[in-house]
């Protein structure tokens, strides 16, 4: 039987292959499709007009990097079952499913005290019921309850696929070139030791560049004074509306 897949052309990574089956069903699901209408960097477009990319695009990019990372780790003798590979790919596709509009603004107003990670988990569990338990392993990995801890680190850690994608993607769309990182080289340097994600010694320079790029992106994009001011005004507006409605 021929390998069936959906091919998506991504401006950052080129062609992204999504296998037909569970992963493609996740991509088509209304809860993930909702992210096509949510900007990845919230109100940063008031400063960087090109920053119109969405959390859906980011989720696909992180999925692509996860696929590359799994292949690389397996090539170094780290045994990963097909079911585990599919589950960790599902987990990264769904990691931002709980995000609302305007980045983290809603966490400080409408859904105060509830993080987007908690909402993501709640929605994942709802989807798992719809899909007759097919996401159970992905949820275990997402919650860091699976024995192979390095799989969770690929989803949420200091050097996860989430960060590798958003730094390259946000750099690309904002035009802040200082944020561009060599994600391909970093992934090639990944390995596992004592059930933890590690980097080969010859990849240290790439990690230093990654840390520097992340810091520069926070200074120039995520914490830019103008977009932060816009967020503060929006928070004040939403809190006032909430007060009047109560």
Where are these regions (language model features)?
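Sequence-structural signature of the catalytic-core scaffold of metal-dependent phosphohydrolases
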Residues: 1-39, 46-90, 98-246
């Amino acid at each position: 039987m021929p390998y069936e897949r959906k091919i998506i052309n991504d401006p950052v990574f080129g062609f992204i292959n999504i296998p037909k089956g569970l992963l493609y069903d996740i991509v088509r699901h209304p809860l993930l499709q909702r992210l096509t209408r949510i900007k990845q960097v919230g109100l940063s477009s008031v400063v960087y007009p090109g920053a119109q990319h969405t959390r859906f695009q980011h989720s696909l990019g992180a999925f692509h990097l996860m696929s590359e990372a799994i292949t690389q780790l397996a090539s170094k003798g780290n045994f990963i079952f097909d079911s585990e590979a599919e589950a960790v790919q599902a987990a990264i596709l769904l990691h931002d499913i709980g995000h609302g509009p305007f980045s983290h603004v809603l966490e400080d107003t409408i859904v105060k005290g509830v993080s987007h990670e908690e909402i993501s988990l709640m929605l994942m569990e709802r989807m798992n019921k719809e899909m007759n338990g097919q996401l159970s392993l992905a949820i275990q990995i997402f919650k860091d309850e699976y024995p192979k801890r390095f799989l969770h680190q690929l989803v949420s850690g200091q050097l996860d696929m989430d960060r590798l994608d958003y730094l390259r993607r946000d750099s690309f769309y904002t035009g802040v070139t200082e944020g561009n990182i060599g994600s391909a080289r970093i992934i090639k340097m990944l390995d596992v030791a004592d059930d933890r994600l590690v980097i080969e010694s010859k990849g240290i320079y790439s990690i230093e560049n990654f840390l520097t790029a992340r810091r520069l992106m926070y200074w120039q994009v995520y914490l830019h004074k103008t977009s932060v001011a816009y967020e503060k005004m929006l928070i004040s507006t939403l809190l006032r509306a909430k007060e009047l409605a109560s």
